[in-house]
Amino acid sequence: MHKNGNNGPVIDTKWHYLGPDSEKYGPYMSKDMLFWLQAGYFNDGLQLKTENEPNYHTLGEWSQLLGTHPFSMPVHSLDATIAQMNSMRPHGAMMMVPPGLQNQFQPPMPMRFPPFLPMPLLHQMNQNGPPMGAQMHSQPPSEPIDAGSLSHTPDSENETRLNEQTLQQPPSWLIALGLAGHGRKPHHHQQILAHQHIPQMQHANVATDQVVMKSVECQTEPVEISKEQASRVLSELLGQMVIIN
């Protein structure tokens, strides 16, 4: 930035620089140049100039003259900055940049920005809110996934019902003997449902019906099967041929 005249407004300096491919880039504002410098894209060997001067100078020349980088203070050009600093020292010697100053600032490493990178947009990357990947999830990653949203679906309920029906189906040999209704036990899921439908106990102050004791007897009729049926049942149970004489 620099002042336009003695009492003019402060104008932001625009910069041009030479990339590693010797191509000219710019103009860019001082805030953009400062962002790329802090990100590690620039070093002391960077060739740059303001829009107010025809010749390029290294970033190291600016840093040695000012004691820091030139992107956070009002500057017009390197020559104008030297003249301004000389005017502030009327009794001192004129400050001149040594001719061989550029050779003292060897780049420690190649500059890492690619030629095709849209440099003016870099300083906006941290100003556009959270990364796009954060919008793909409907909840924060720290929150656990709700298991109810995954297990209580129509497909899972149908699969559970099919498994219950398969477990409740009697063996084939009971069906062949007409005994499919004997020995059938309620499934665990049915026991839970039956337990849920048990009426709750009443309060102690609520009157109940008088208990009536009764004795009940029952007679179980025997199941008659033939030798052939018994032989087939035993063969299926033992896994080998059984012959009843």
UniProtKB/Swiss-Prot annotation:
Keywords: Developmental protein, Notch signaling pathway
GO biological-process terms attached to the record: negative regulation of Notch signaling pathway; Notch signaling pathway; regulation of protein deneddylation
Start and end residues of each GYF domain: 12-60
Sequence intervals crossing the membrane: none
Disulfides per UniProt: none
SMART domains associated with the record: GYF (SM00444)
Region of interest called Disordered, as start-end residue ranges on this chain: 126-166
Top-level taxonomic group: Eukaryota
SUPFAM superfamilies: GYF domain (SSF55277)
GO cellular component, one term: cleavage furrow
MF annotations from Gene Ontology: WD40-repeat domain binding
UniProt key word Ubl conjugation: no
Phenotype seen when the gene is deleted: Partially penetrant phenotypes when temperature elevated to 25 degrees Celsius which include embryonic lethality, reduced brood size, egg retention and an increased incidence of males.
Function: Involved in negative regulation of early and late embryonic Notch signaling.
Protein name according to UniProt: Suppressor of aph-1
Organism: Caenorhabditis elegans
Lineage of origin: Eukaryota, Metazoa, Ecdysozoa, Nematoda, Chromadorea
Primary gene name: sao-1
